[in-house]
Amino acid sequence: MARSVKKGPFLDDFLVKKVDVLREGSRKELIKTWSRRSTIIHEFVGYTFGVHNGRKFIPVLVTENMVGHKLGEFAPTRTYYGHGVDKKAKRR
């Protein structure tokens, strides 16, 4: 079920404050965050966020196409090594 329109997108307040501070100083640096649940809004376009994946911070450059998605969608938490190889087929 989608979030109600009258509530608006979910954002952690500290994340908006960090972007405002960078905007005033007109700097473009990495914004580290553990808030994977925050929705990307238009004000975030052009900034690079370091989204924590449980082990390290993954740099995510926000583009116009990402607006409306969550930050966590762009920092995968699991490493995929492929499916197991059949040992019988490998011997041949």
UniProtKB/Swiss-Prot annotation:
The keyword Cell cycle does not apply. It comes from the Bacteria. One of its GO terms (biological process) is translation. GO terms for cellular component: cytoplasm; small ribosomal subunit. The keyword Plastid does not apply. Keywords: Ribonucleoprotein, Ribosomal protein, RNA-binding, rRNA-binding. GO terms for molecular function: rRNA binding; structural constituent of ribosome. Pfam families: Ribosomal_S19 (PF00203). Protein S19 forms a complex with S13 that binds strongly to the 16S ribosomal RNA. PANTHER family: RIBOSOMAL PROTEIN S19P FAMILY MEMBER (PTHR11880), SMALL RIBOSOMAL SUBUNIT PROTEIN US19M (PTHR11880:SF8). Belongs to the universal ribosomal protein uS19 family. This is Small ribosomal subunit protein uS19. It comes from Magnetococcus marinus (strain ATCC BAA-1437 / JCM 17883 / MC-1). The gene is rpsS.
